[in-house]
Amino acid sequence: MGLGHITDVPGILVGHYQRRGKGWRTGTTVVRVDGGAMSSCDVRGGGPGTRETDLLDPTAMIDRVHAICLSGGSAYGLAAAHGVMRWHEEHHAGFPVGPQPSHVVPIVPAAVIFDLGRGGVFTNRPNDEFGFRACAAARSGAVTMGSVGAGTGAVAGGLQGGVGTASITLESGILVGALAV
């Protein structure tokens, strides 16, 4: 029996990076799958902030993503995905586009939440370094939940939000994992 976390699914790794204090209260969470994995998403809401989610359409040419980046910082936080791409490029992981192992384009869909100014300074928000560090921190095993990573500045209806994860094995034997902010 597993931990009841998304990392119960073989090959899935999760990493967080966040900053608190001195005007900061935001972060980034990365779900990394070495070798890539099929993925999908459902974008809702009146002001969604996303990047590369069109690639998750089943009719798209790309059939694998290398990581998913979830971040605070509203639209500014989408910059964290660049750091995730940089980490993958340095590890020669991505969609091959040339003859050299380093000639790759990592496929990293991203989504953000609005947490601007939660720490007191509006301009303190995730950047590419947040994504790089969260990706480098990705591990299997127990996932830290609550006010970490992308959930650091999460608030809903005045209540503190955060990162949560779960997994379940269906009667068919298929293992399903989920992570949400």
Which residues does each PLM region occupy?
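Alpha/propeptide regions of enzymes that mature by internal proteolysis
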Residues: 1-181
